[in-house]
Amino acid sequence: MTKEEKNEKEALIEFFSSYRELFEFFCSNTTIHGAIRLVCSRRNRMKTAFWLVLFLVTFGLMYWQFGLLFGQYFSYPVSINLNVNSDKLPFPAVTVCTLNPYRYKAIQNDLQELDKETQRTLYELYKYNSTGVQGWIPNNQRVKRDRAGLPYLLELLPPGSETHRVSRSVIEEELQVKRREWNIGFKLCNETGGDCFYQTYTSGVDAIREWYRFHYINILARVPQEAAIDGEQLENFIFACRFNEESCTKANYSSFHHAIYGNCYTFNQNQSDQSNLWSSSMPGIKNGLTLVLRTEQHDYIPLLSSVAGARVLVHGHKEPAFMDDNGFNIPPGMETSIGMKKETINRLGGKYSDCSEDGSDVDVKNLFQSEYTEQVCVRSCFQAAMVARCGCGYAFYPLSPGDQYCDYNKHKSWGHCYYKLIIEFTSNKLGCFTKCRKPCLVSEYQLTAGYSKWPNRVSQDWVLHTLSRQYNLTDRNGIAKLNIYFEELNYKTILESPTINMAMLLSLLGSQWSLWFGSSVLSVVEMLELVIDFVIIGVMILLHRYYYKKANEGEETTVVPTPAPAFADLEQQVPHIPRGDLSQRQISVVADITPPPAYESLDLRSVGTLSSRSSSMRSNRSYYEENGGRRN
């Protein structure tokens, strides 16, 4: 095989020698519509220019659509899917509070002193006299509050007053003219006394309740957290309890004390044994929870709670009872029926929404013994900020081990710190609402309430007579009835799903590609091949230029040395011959003059003819010799 044949043999991988050759091959063989028009009409420059512009515009529009699709995909939109299911439903937890804060014996004296100071304040500011509060001083005496007693006394403040207290004479004169424009509040200062402000209110009722609440929280910090509610208090509050037409047992509820809403009892919250939780297989009042509650107001704190009845909250089994957020009150002397509808929301996590699966990815420590919720996180965040800023914790929220609740006997300026922290908290300067994300899976209960008078006139006598025999109760305003049930077993499930997933994105991209070029995935591969070949040709051109330039630089800088004459050594080796002996030793040179060969005989086409002539001559010669040199 000659060298030319070896070069003509097809190689395993071949590359184009120029961009023009690559472009012409691609346009002539690609499956992309319109590309062949760029080379088939090259003799007509106008057509070539038209198809080139059309091809580029179409290409640009397609990739503009691609950009829109990718932008929509990477914005991670979600679609809402609503499913309606019907099945046996687990009954939620129900917490009921008395709406009467209890007087602990450990702080009984402190609460009595607070009541006396409150009555002095009411008489001094509003000339109110009540004999229903323990320790009341007769109204015929001039009441002056002892500033050596409780700190942070209530004061009347003129409009615009922020840092000073107005004298009593000025107050009495001005109140006769513009009573509505005056505010009431109490002064709070930091530890050094250099930073002070008034916590003011336009309503005297709100101011007195908040002032009383502030001191009550301070006193409550001295109560041991292990203080339990005895069984006698439960029987005095809940007269009857039935679920699914069966009586409740002590295993069905747990109790705790709330500083504002009093003694609270939670039904159906047995986190240790989920098998004992209630469930409803039928809708209706008979298949729900029915409670008969006492709503009398005896031996409680009237200045802290001004509402009669009971506080109710429906929540999840593993969620804490935040009575001040989602709870509602039921009135005394009425039957309140609460119908429920369950709704489950399942959000997509990750890049699709800012939700948390279990709170482990949230930078806030959960202080509650419960599962993660947004409210749990927000309160834990506030408590952590208060402990860090004020040196003590809020009495309504749990603490980390080693921390203490706020008491102005130990923490003198905690009130000043607390009210300023509340302002930062509500304006999200603490960042709690930003840090705390919604849980991805949430179960909510949509509630509808109905009220009716209970007991009615016909049954009032015998119902109250029976209750008076058992519980010494004779007033219909001292009882209330509560029904909580499922209106229907159909529950909604709201699911989030990606609006554009990967399969849909590929489908949309393929649709756009087919719309603008009428091609397929193989056409995309051809485009990739074109790009790869383009890059390879560019690399080859650069390498060729590099090595060519390097070779030229080497030829210019290289100096070739002149070799020594080769005959020098020969002269030394040739022996000296005397001039007289030259005649005897002369060498005769005979030139052989031979004509050049006939190059016409080298013609390959005449090889066959010459060989045939030679063979003919040899045959004739042999014949002539055999016949003795005779010719025919």
UniProtKB/Swiss-Prot annotation:
Residues 71-520 are extracellular. GO terms for cellular component: acrosomal vesicle; apical plasma membrane; ciliary membrane; cytoplasm; motile cilium; plasma membrane; sodium channel complex. Originally identified and characterized by its inhibition by the diuretic drug amiloride. Residues 623-632 have a biased composition (Basic and acidic residues). Keywords: Cell membrane, Cell projection, Cilium, Cytoplasm, Cytoplasmic vesicle, Disulfide bond, Flagellum, Ion channel, Ion transport, Membrane, Sodium, Sodium channel, Sodium transport, Transmembrane, Transmembrane helix, Transport. Residues 612-632 are annotated as: Disordered. The chain crosses the membrane at residues 50-70, 521-541. This is one of the three pore-forming subunits of the heterotrimeric epithelial sodium channel (ENaC), a critical regulator of sodium balance and fluid homeostasis. ENaC operates in epithelial tissues, where it mediates the electrodiffusion of sodium ions from extracellular fluid through the apical membrane of cells, with water following osmotically. It plays a key role in maintaining sodium homeostasis through electrogenic sodium reabsorption in the kidneys. This is Epithelial sodium channel subunit alpha. It comes from Xenopus laevis (African clawed frog). The gene is scnn1a.
